């Protein structure tokens, strides 16, 4: 079987993420693609605040562009197409686009327990973000 790659993204960009705008630096877009999965699109330089998913694992699947994922107290991990990150419950983290690239990742939660919630915290500082290359 021959595998072909394509140079376009099949996932919809979605609508401006107005409900969560105050929890992001920059603009993001959200598309519900079904089955509890969302495509999140970040403009260059956009990232979400530090946050914790209580009683749920979050899975990120990078589908286009380039960006970053970072857990509190650890080095940032580069996101690029094909990278999958499984974020354990109770881990403080953030994710977003690189300064010079859009980023799209699929996001869903698994192993969701009763009482699951998100705790949004402080913004990722410009100083911290600007260290990433």
Which role does the model predict for each range below?
Residues 30-32, 37-41, 59, 76, ...:
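Conserved hydrophobic/aromatic beta-strand scaffold that supports enzyme active sites
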Residues 68, 76, 80-81, 89-116:
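Ligand-binding loop in jelly-roll beta-barrel domains
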Residues 25-27, 56, 101-102:
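Short acidic/glycine-enriched loop/turn segments that link adjacent beta-strands
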Residues 47, 54-81, 91:
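A short beta-strand-loop-beta hairpin characteristic of the jelly-roll/cupin
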Residues 38-53:
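Conserved short histidine dyad/triad with adjacent acidic residue
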Residues 1-35, 117-133:
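A short, N-terminal "cap"/entry segment at the start of jelly-roll beta-barrel domains
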């Amino acid at each position: 079987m021959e595998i072909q790659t394509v140079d376009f993204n099949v996932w919809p960009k979605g609508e401006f993420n107005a409900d969560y705008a105050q929890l992001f630096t920059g603009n993001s877009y959200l598309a519900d693609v079904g089955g509890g999965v969302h495509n999140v699109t970040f403009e260059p330089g956009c990232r979400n605040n530090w946050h914790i998913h209580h009683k749920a694992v979050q899975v990120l699947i990078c589908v286009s562009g380039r960006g970053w994922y970072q857990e509190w107290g650890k080095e940032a991990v580069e996101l690029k197409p094909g990278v999958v990150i499984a974020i354990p419950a109770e881990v403080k983290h953030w994710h977003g686009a690189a300064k010079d690239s859009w980023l799209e990742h699929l996001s869903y939660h698994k192993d969701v327990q009763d009482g699951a919630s998100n705790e949004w915290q402080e913004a990722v500082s410009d100083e911290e973000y600007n260290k990433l290359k």
